[in-house]
Amino acid sequence: MESPLQVPDRRSISVVTPVYNGEASIVELCRRLSEVLPQIATQYEIILVNDGSQDRSWEVISELSSHSATVRGLNLMRNYGQHNALLCGIRAAKYELVLTIDDDLQHPPEEIPQLLARLDEGFDVVYGAPKTEQNGLMRALASHITRLALRAAVGSDVAKNVSAFRVFRTQLREAFANYQSPFVSIDVLLTWATTRFGATTVVFQPRHSGSSNYTFTKLVRHGRIFSSTPVSSHAACKLGHCFR
């Protein structure tokens, strides 16, 4: 009898996590990921992208990387924003699927098999849609802006389920390989590559510690995702250093 965590057709997975002041949660996140991933993947990696944290996040990431061959660290020189950090991690991913998950433990790693099972139904992108939103006001407004922007591209049914807990086929990144702008929305970029979007309901958890990092300034920046200022997001991946 199969374990409840198993899904058909074990595959290779790159987990990408943008980290901003996440020193209190990333050790626990990696521990839980390391329990789930071996049961559902033949190969996996955990890419932690330090997005200009002001705490000891990079020191913790460095320590995790030095003790585990599956953990990789990318260190950005300053805070570029969640989606820019995600884009750097996505471009560094080496396995067939990319799964994005926040650093605050609101997205339970134990729910990953549900996303993969839904992907096996023929989708290219699958979101973990929360039964109940756990976000603060600014984060909720940012999510609302994203959903409004995506509605025309993917339809209202898909747009309402968009979240930062997502899995997609790594080959989709080829559609935005040359994208260069400081204003990045991973969800918009994914619409350049496919129309096969799906979702599955998962239970989000309260934040492990601290409060949301979304500020009014970040909210305004998030609302400008369609800007085309010719500054390379890809360059941000080079402005720092990485492990493995």
Write out the residue ranges for each language-model feature:
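Hydrophobic helical membrane-anchoring modules
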Residues: 1-9, 185-244
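Structured catalytic core of nucleotide-sugar glycosyltransferases
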Residues: 1-137, 149
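Residues at alpha-helix boundaries and short interhelical turns
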Residues: 20-23, 68, 180, 194, ...
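Non-catalytic alpha-helical coupling and interface elements of nucleotide-dependent molecular machines
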Residues: 38, 66, 150-154, 195, ...
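Acceptor/aglycone-binding surface of glycosyltransferases and processive sugar-polymer synthases
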Residues: 72-78, 82-92, 97, 106-188, ...
